[in-house]
């Protein structure tokens, strides 16, 4: 659903002065900014049929249940499965912001397009933003350990960044239905996180707090919508 929306926006020639993304949304950010509607489709539809995409075989090898290095780095190169148009991405005048979570420091970090000016730097950042704890191995960037940006203060709803930068009209794409409410983290997941990330307690804290942060973010977003400051897309189911 989200990939189809991104492809349609590109096909209609729609662009924005500021684009923020987190987790899977960071991949959408890249495809949208590079104006590649076909890659938007292929990344979220065809790629799952690739035997290198993931599975227990890759998980047992330490690559993650979703083979993150392949999905977010290897396929992007000219000889990869889905080459990325870096030149168009960089030429787009839009400001871009990708949310990640620095587990070493216990804080959110936003990366700009200027910090993703090569495929060697872009791939790890998008991978970090999308790295689901336990299911995917963490990413090292500049000596620090990174995981999914949804563990930050916005709970995975990155519309807070354009608001901080002064934007007052937003288009926001949500992946859950309008009436969705996130449930608290199960105790079993918490125990697993404490064990797997004992050296990074901020990961457990980020996941534990995400329910409240995410639900609060949705409430704020719908308030902005009521005030005419946000146009919100939600799936029917």
Feature names for model-found ranges:
Residues 1-19, 30-237:
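Patatin-like phospholipase
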Residues 23:
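Catalytic nucleophile serine of serine hydrolases
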Residues 26-28:
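Active/ligand-binding-proximal structured segments within catalytic/core domains
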């Amino acid at each position: 659903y989200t990939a189809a929306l991104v492809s349609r926006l590109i096909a209609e020639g729609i662009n924005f002065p500021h684009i923020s993304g987190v987790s899977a949304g960071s991949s959408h950010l890249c495809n949208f900014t590079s104006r590649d509607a076909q890659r938007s489709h292929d990344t979220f539809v065809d790629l799952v049929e690739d035997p290198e995409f993931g599975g227990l075989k890759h998980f047992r090898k330490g690559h993650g249940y979703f083979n993150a290095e392949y999905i977010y780095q290897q396929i992007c190169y000219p000889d990869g499965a889905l080459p990325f148009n870096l030149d168009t991405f960089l030429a787009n005048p839009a400001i871009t912001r990708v949310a990640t979570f620095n587990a070493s420091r216990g804080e959110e970090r936003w990366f700009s397009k200027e910090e993703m000016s090569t495929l060697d730097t872009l791939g790890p950042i998008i991978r970090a933003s999308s790295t689901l704890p336990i299911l995917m191995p963490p990413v090292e960037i500049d000596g620090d350990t990174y995981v999914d940006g949804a563990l930050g203060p916005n709970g995975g709803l990155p519309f807070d960044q354009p608001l901080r930068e002064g934007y007052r009209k937003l288009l926001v794409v949500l992946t859950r239905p309008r009436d969705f409410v996130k449930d608290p983290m199960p105790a079993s997941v918490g125990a697993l996180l404490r064990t797997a990330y004992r050296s990074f307690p901020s990961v457990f804290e980020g996941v534990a707090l995400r329910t409240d942060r995410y639900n609060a973010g949705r409430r704020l977003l719908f308030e902005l919508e009521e005030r005419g400051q946000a146009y919100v897309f939600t799936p029917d189911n």
